Amino acid sequence: SAIAAWTPSMINNQNSQDDIYCLTPFLEAMRDKGAYCDWYQYGDYWKKSTPELWGINLNARNNLQKGMNPPDCGSYKNNEGAADQLDFWIEADWCGMVCPAQVNSAIDIAWRAGHVIGYGESVYGGIAVAAMQSKAFTATNVTEIFDAGRYSIPADCLTRKMFDDVIAWKNAGQTYDQNFASLRNKYPAHNHGACASMDLGFVAIGLLYGNGN
């Protein structure tokens, strides 16, 4: 569909977009405590945040307000078994934006901030997004961006396996639709709307088949 024409009133739409306003407490922590504040400081600002939250974002804040500290507040043990949901990675582009072309620094920040909210694949997804966003400032092609995310996370984690799969299927000649179906078929247990790994796998497919966009 066509992109809507811009109107000034659209700026207020961000107030209802949790993948935008949820980064505010982290940026406030960096502003006040420095670029390399620790996860306890990030957690303190998340605990005091006031926006409407859902999912593991809300669970983590509730845990913090009960006196729990990172990384326990975001752990699967204390986050209703859902700590691998996508909440952190849809917000994690800020980690790369504040570290233009400094991929390792973006990864470091994402590791600390991510454990305030999630655990495991949720954090790995955020790290991959942070790395790709940081690399995008100087990358000359999409492959460089894709590889920055792919190689920023452990080879044995689920998110990395999905990155490996989609590039292998692309190189084997699969079309966009075939690749999309292959990913869903290989990982049926993760084929739901909140899975951090699966949703980031879809992002990876979009990068690979976007003709440089």
Where are these regions (language model features)?
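Generic N-terminal targeting/processing segments that precede catalytic cores or assembly contacts
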Residues: 1-12
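Active-site cavity-forming subdomains of large catalytic enzyme subunits
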Residues: 10-18, 22-126, 138-139, 143-145
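Accessory "access/gating" subregions that flank catalytic or transport cores
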Residues: 64-83, 94-102, 111-116, 130-213
